[in-house]
Every structure is written in structure tokens, then in C-alpha cells.
Swiss-Prot record:
It comes from the Bacteria. Residues 383-395 have a biased composition (Low complexity). The keyword Magnesium does not apply. This is DNA mismatch repair protein MutL. InterPro entries: DNA_mismatch_repair_CS, DNA_mismatch_repair_MutL, DNA_mismatch_S5_2-like, HATPase_C_sf, MutL/Mlh/PMS, MutL/Mlh/Pms-like, MutL_C, MutL_C_dimsub. Residues 375-395 are annotated as: Disordered. One of its GO terms (molecular function) is ATP hydrolysis activity. One of its GO terms (biological process) is mismatch repair. GO terms for cellular component: mismatch repair complex. The keyword Methyltransferase does not apply. It comes from Bacillus cereus (strain ATCC 14579 / DSM 31 / CCUG 7414 / JCM 2152 / NBRC 15305 / NCIMB 9373 / NCTC 2599 / NRRL B-3711). Pfam families: DNA_mis_repair (PF01119), HATPase_c_3 (PF13589), MutL_C (PF08676). Keywords: DNA damage, DNA repair. Belongs to the DNA mismatch repair MutL/HexB family.
Length: 647
């Protein structure tokens, strides 16, 4: 007898469940997507013990006909595709026909459904076996309950996280679905406590306000663009509103939430030099395209996709975001930095707390600013500030964060309900309706961000603090300018232009500069000699593992030539493949930082005026190349409120 045999359906479903049903969040995702495919306009999600004990999904969709109920729980049975051509033109969220049989094989499942024009169907399945099937009275739609998930696969239960973690995974996926389909009203409950309620009025900004807070919604920039193949719509936050994780960016393709690293990267590139290192925006981007241009049949979870015109799409996203930011004055209000964390900090990691300790600023050596002596000799910088009273220094102490003890999940021992599900109490209370109406009103009252160009407003200097910050004013209030960041931006745009030119003047070194490398480093640099010439670095081989540099571009900062050469060589060695665009960018950023005014350097009035005038000529006068803000605004109203002149 042969060794190879065909597996029975029950074992096949258990194996398939390993890919489709990883955790309770997978069950919620698949069932809610089925409800959306069934044209539901209202969906309720009820959880007990983060879904490990019970998941109940109630919708008002098309329902399932009696003759289809049994077939729906067979593998690869679906109403969404019929032939091979449909597989390449998928418009629905589900299509594989694996979710329902996989879920039923590892749980105790109860289904009540009706199409509205015939009696409903009541079905009970335990571990893939049909226990009960009968007709029942039911409204149009589907009511499906999944209990005791993984009851027959105890090994899977061992790998489940705590209730808090599993609930965080569920809320994350529900939030993404809510953003993907603002036309559907979603309600999420855990142990009878409401976690989310969206109105279903189609306003995605209202959904974002429900998830991330009304304060974040006020800082959203609308994004819209169209090409021959793609249509992009969405919202992204101003650069002043950032988070420490990429999880706050959501990408939707043809109504389906997807995880795609290159799309995330394109959004980040749209914020080029506007975000600090390690900070990410909150964003929602919906992309519509011909289904032929995207392959969603990559993984059973359907979270990964492939694009056939990927580079064209990425370019469109980058250019659209950059064009939007060029229309806005990106000056953060001082209030943004002093507010406590908004509720959205806990959206993706609901039960984890981010601890941050302030870093002390470094104080590099003092150098005079560049670019200020074009027409006249630079006045001597003031080395000592006026003798003013200074308050005693106090060390900042972060508040003690609340830490909850996580509890392990214990599976419920309740038997499956053999009777039809009773109608639960109505959650549409007057109080809940009022809260939703109040949110709708707040969102309607949000003023659109002005897109009148990003020119720096007129600023009139009035002083300097600690040799680091310049104070200026105009009719809109007080501005504080970081002098180092300001000149860093000026120098960056100057060097970026210079590094980008292949034909450039060079200056001979009096003594050739020798660079000794390890064999691995030498071979890597040798491969990139032509690329290095494009950024003005001309190397000659000198011995077995050395190079010499005889000249350098004239725009290298004086006295820092060898240091810059070493830095550029280090970048080449560090990168496995040299991206000439990135290399030029890094070189410009490095030189701009080294050539800029340092902290604790007091400037004369002439120097301050010259600095602000040069800043005005830059294409982006609002952030340094590292993404830190150059200036912060205190409105006149805020100042009056601080001094109780207004209440």
C-alpha cells in the first residue's frame, strides 16, 4: 500500500485554519469582511474575553439562502468568483472560500441568517461537524456567533497572548475596516462596553476623529490626486503631529486594508525632511485602481498585495504629498508640544505605555554662520549675553505611568448554546446618539487648513534667548526660531544644489589625503568609484588597500575637508548598494549641520536679520533637514489667555 494518501476534509480544514485563523482578530476580520461583501450598512461586533470566549457579528446584509448555508461551510465554496477571469478582477474583500470552514473547524459556531423573503436558517456547527439545522424566524441579515475558539486545538491556545494584547489586535483591524468603509456603521463592544461607534455617513474624517480624537482630526491635510491608472484620496497629519510607530498609517487598496512597506515608504518620502528621525505621521490613504493592476491572491490572510505599476504609484503618492505641503505654512503652534498625549497614542497598542526621557542638547564648537557676508564684512558675534537673572535649573521628572498587570486568559467552559440567540438589549441609547451627533457637529465645524502657499510670514526680531533661540513677532503673535535649525536648512539647500552638479570646480589639496581600508571595505569602495565621482569625490588607488584624494569640490566647508571625505566614505562602506540620490542627500545634510551656527552663540541684530532673510528664500523654511521644527508660534490669543486677559 502506498504511503501517500488524501487527507479528509476535517483535517484539511484544521490545516487551512492554521493560516486563515491565527488568532481572534483573524476571525473578526473575516466575518466583518463577509458582512461588508453582503452589502451591510450596519455591523455590530460583540466580544467576550477578547474573542477567545465569544465573538458575535450581527449585520443587516443580504443574508444567506437556506440551500447555501451548508455549502458555505465547505472548503473553496464562494459566491464571489466563478471562473479564472474573476480571480484577476476581484472587487470583493473575500474570494477564497476558506474562512468559514476554517473558523467552524476550530470553534463552536452558531449561525442565524435570512434573506428577508423566506424563513431564516439556524445552524450549529462544532469542530466542523453539523450539530443542528432548522428553520427559524429571523430578520434580514446574518447573526453569527463563534465560541470557545481553538477548543479542539489546545496547542494553539498556548500561543495566545493576554486578553489585553488580543483585544488590541482586534481593535486595530476593526479601526482599519472602519476607515476603509466609512459608509458602514460599525459598533464594537467588549464585555458589553462600547469601544467604537461610527455613524456610517461616509465621512472618513469623522471616523478618524472617532479613532484618533478630534484634536488630531483638526490637523489633517486632505490628499487627492488622479492619474490614468490610479486615484488617491485620504488624509495625513501635519508634520507637527507624529507618532513613534508606522502603525498609525493605513493604506487601503480598492476598499481593502493592506500592509505594504513600499506604500508606507512612499508616504514617508512625501514628508521628505519634514519629520524627525524615528517619527511617523498619522495617515489614511485610499487608492483606487483597475483590479488587473493589483494581485490580492498572495496570502490567505489577504493583507499582502503586489502592484504591476508600482513605481508609477509610488511617484504619484510622493509628489501628491509634497505638493500639498508646499501650499501650507507649516508653523506648529506651541500648544501642540505642551498637550498631554491624545487618546490615539493607545489606538494600536492599547495597553502599552510609551516612556520617553528628554535628551540633553549637545553643544558643539562655536562657528560663525556662513552665507551672511556676501555684501559686507560680518560684525563680530557677541560672545557673552547681557547679565540677566536666570531661574535655578530643575531636573525634569517624567510622571509615573500607570502599569496594569496583565492577566492570562482562561478558556470558558460553557457549552455551546443549543437555542437560537435571543435579541440583546438595544445599544442605540439616547446618550450614545447624542455623543455621535456631538462628534459629527465637531467634525463639521473643523476649519479646512489654509493652502495659501508656504512662504514664511514677515517676522520682526525682538531678541535672543540662551544664545540658541531668536524671538520675533508679527500681527499674529510671537515666534521662537531655533537659529541652528534655521541655518541648517539654508546650508542644506545650498549644498544639495552643489552636490547635485557633476561639473564642478575643484581645489587641489596641498598634501594628498590617504584613506586606509580593510580588504572588504576596499573592494566595496572600488565598486563605487564612478558613483563617488558624481558627488565630487575623486579617489585614486594607492597600494593594495588604500586610496588617496588629491582634490575636492570648492564648496566643501573650509577646514572640514578630510572630515567630510571620511564621512562620505563611511556611508559608502555602510551601504551595500550605493543609491546616488541618497548619498547626495546624506552628504548635503552632513555638511549643512557642520557648517551651521551652534547653540549658545549670541548674534548681533544684523546677523539675526540676515539669517531670517536667507531663511525666507528657502523652499521649505519650516523644518531642518532632520525634520525638527525651525520655528514655533504662540498666537496673541494664547498669550492673552496665559495672562488671564481673556477667559
Amino acid at each position: 500500500m502506498g504511503k501517500i494518501r488524501k487527507l479528509d476534509d476535517q483535517l484539511s480544514n484544521l490545516i487551512a485554519a492554521g493560516e486563515v485563523v491565527e488568532r481572534p482578530a483573524s476571525v473578526v476580520k473575516e466575518l466583518v469582511e463577509n458582512s461588508i461583501d453582503a452589502n451591510s450598512t450596519s455591523i455590530e461586533i460583540h466580544l467576550e474575553e477578547a474573542g477567545l470566549s465569544k465573538i458575535r457579528i450581527i449585520d443587516n446584509g443580504d443574508g444567506i439562502a437556506e440551500e447555501d448555508c451548508i455549502v458555505a461551510f465547505e472548503r473553496h465554496a464562494t459566491s464571489k468568483i466563478k471562473d479564472e477571469n474573476d480571480l484577476f478582477r476581484i472587487r470583493t474583500l473575500g474570494f477564497r472560500g476558506e474562512a468559514l470552514p476554517s473558523i467552524a473547524s476550530v470553534s463552536e459556531l452558531e449561525l442565524i441568517t435570512s434573506t428577508g423573503d423566506a424563513p431564516g436558517t439556524h445552524l450549529i456547527i462544532k469542530g466542523g461537524d453539523i450539530i443542528k439545522q432548522e428553520k427559524t424566524a429571523s430578520r434580514k441579515g446574518t447573526d453569527i456567533t463563534v465560541q470557545n475558539l481553538f477548543f479542539n486545538t489546545p496547542a494553539r491556545l498556548k500561543y495566545m497572548k493576554t486578553i489585553h494584547t488580543e483585544l488590541g489586535n482586534i481593535t486595530d483591524i476593526v479601526y482599519r475596516i472602519a476607515m476603509s468603509h466609512p459608509e458602514v456603521s460599525l459598533k464594537l463592544f467588549h464585555n458589553e462596553k462600547k469601544l467604537l461607534h461610527t455613524s456610517g455617513n461616509g465621512d472618513v474624517r469623522q471616523v478618524l476623529a472617532s479613532i484618533y480624537s478630534i484634536q488630531v482630526a483638526k490637523k489633517l491635510v486632505p490628499i487627492e490626486a488622479e492619474s490614468l491608472d490610479f486615484t488617491i484620496k485620504g488624509y495625513v497629519t501635519l508634520p507637527e503631529v507624529t507618532r513613534a510607530s508606522r502603525n498609525y498609517m493605513s493604506t487601503i487598496v480598492n476598499g481593502r486594508y493592506v500592509r505594504n512597506f513600499v506604500l508606507m515608504k512612499a508616504i514617508q518620502q512625501g514628508y521628505h525632511t519634514l519629520l524627525p528621525v524615528g517619527r511617523y505621521p498619522i495617515g489614511f490613504l485610499s487608492i483606487e485602481m483597475d483590479p488587473m493592476l493589483v494581485d490580492v491572491n498572495v496570502h490567505p490572510a489577504k493583507l499582502e498585495v503586489r502592484f504591476s505599476k508600482e513605481q508609477e504609484l509610488l511617484k504619484l503618492i510622493e509628489e501628491t504629498l509634497q505638493a500639498a505641503f508646499k501650499k501650507i505654512q507649516l508653523i506648529p503652534d506651541a500648544g501642540v508640544t505642551t498637550k498631554k498625549k491624545e487618546k490615539d497614542e493607545s489606538v494600536q497598542e492599547q495597553f502599552q505605555f510609551e516612556h520617553a526621557k528628554p535628551k540633553e542638547p549637545s553643544m558643539p564648537d562655536i562657528v560663525l554662520p556662513t552665507g551672511m557676508d556676501a555684501k559686507q564684512e560680518e560684525p563680530q558675534a557677541v560672545k557673552q549675553p547681557p547679565q540677566l537673572w536666570q531661574p535655578p535649573k530643575q531636573e525634569w521628572q517624567p510622571p509615573q505611568s500607570l502599569i496594569r498587570e496583565e492577566q492570562s486568559w482562561q478558556p470558558s467552559t460553557k457549552p455551546i448554546i443549543e437555542e437560537p440567540i435571543q435579541e440583546e438589549k438595544s445599544w442605540d441609547s439616547n446618550e450614545e446618539d447624542f455623543e455621535l451627533e456631538e462628534l459629527e457637529e465637531e467634525v463639521r465645524e473643523i476649519k479646512e487648513i489654509e493652502m495659501n502657499g508656504n512662504d514664511l510670514p514677515p517676522l520682526y526680531p525682538i531678541g535672543q534667548m540662551h544664545g540658541t533661540y531668536i524671538f520675533a513677532q508679527n500681527d499674529k503673535g510671537l515666534y521662537m526660531i531655533d537659529q541652528h535649525a534655521a541655518q541648517e536648512r539654508i546650508n542644506y539647500e545650498y549644498f544639495r544644489d552643489k552636490v547635485g552638479r557633476v561639473a564642478q570646480e575643484v581645489q587641489e589639496l596641498l598634501v594628498p589625503y590617504r584613506i586606509d581600508l580593510s580588504l572588504t571595505e576596499f573592494l566595496r569602495v572600488e565598486e563605487q568609484l564612478e558613483e563617488l565621482k558624481k558627488v565630487g569625490l575623486f579617489l585614486e588607488q594607492f597600494g593594495h588597500q588604500s586610496f588617496i584624494v588629491r582634490s575636492h569640490p570648492t564648496w566643501f566647508p573650509k577646514g572640514q575637508e578630510t572630515e567630510i571625505i571620511d564621512e562620505m566614505m563611511e556611508q559608502v562602506v555602510k551601504l551595500k548598494k550605493v543609491d546616488i540620490k541618497k548619498l547626495r542627500e546624506e552628504a548635503a545634510i552632513m555638511m549643512s549641520c557642520k557648517a551651521s551656527i551652534k547653540a549658545n552663540q549670541y548674534l548681533t541684530n544684523d546677523q539675526i536679520f540676515a539669517l531670517l532673510e536667507e531663511l525666507r528664500t528657502t523652499t521649505n523654511p519650516y523644518t531642518c533637514p532632520h525634520g525638527r521644527p525651525i520655528l514655533v508660534h504662540h498666537s496673541t490669543y494664547e498669550l492673552e489667555k496665559m495672562f488671564k486677559r481673556v477667559m
